[in-house]
Amino acid sequence: MKILCVSDQIDPLIYNSNAVKNFPDIDLILCAGDLPMDYVDFIVSVFNKPTYFIFGNHDLKEYKYYHNVPGTNSSPAATSQTNSHFVSNNINKTDQHNHHHGAIYAGFKNLRLKLVSFSKNNKKKTPLLLTGVSGSIKYNNGLCQFTENEMKFKLVKLIPGLLLNKLR
């Protein structure tokens, strides 16, 4: 399985008309934070591959659509997504708000990707498990910044979903 991972800045090798020629055989794309959502949208449109993203601590204009943020008009999807420990990608169309840009938000969720699988030595197809963690260490009380204890608590909440997957 070949995964294209992008983060932090717009890459001219990707953000051009030859992007598919530069990366012809990728299976999956991970957008690992601090990217403008228009760039994520471009990546989804050009590559037409399963794309997953998290937020970093910058470019947070659309963060409110995926999380409950006091003082904003958060989407109903934010409430249901933040309370779940395990999300199967076959229900994401009903979960996502209109601002998804074609990519699936993986922040603080375990995603069992039935459409993206890999084969082990025994040739059995196994769904890929992807767990996303958004944000950074708290340094100015901005959005998507967490203390060490806050992050530990968020990570511990992901454990039941990971254990459930292990039992399958």
Per-range role (PLM):
Residues L30, Y52-I54, A106, T131:
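Hydrophobic/aromatic beta-strand patches that form the interior of the parallel beta-sheet core
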Residues I43, K64-Y66:
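Short secondary-structure transition/capping segments
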Residues D34-L35, I54-K61:
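Short, acidic/turn-prone active-site loops that include or flank metal/cofactor-
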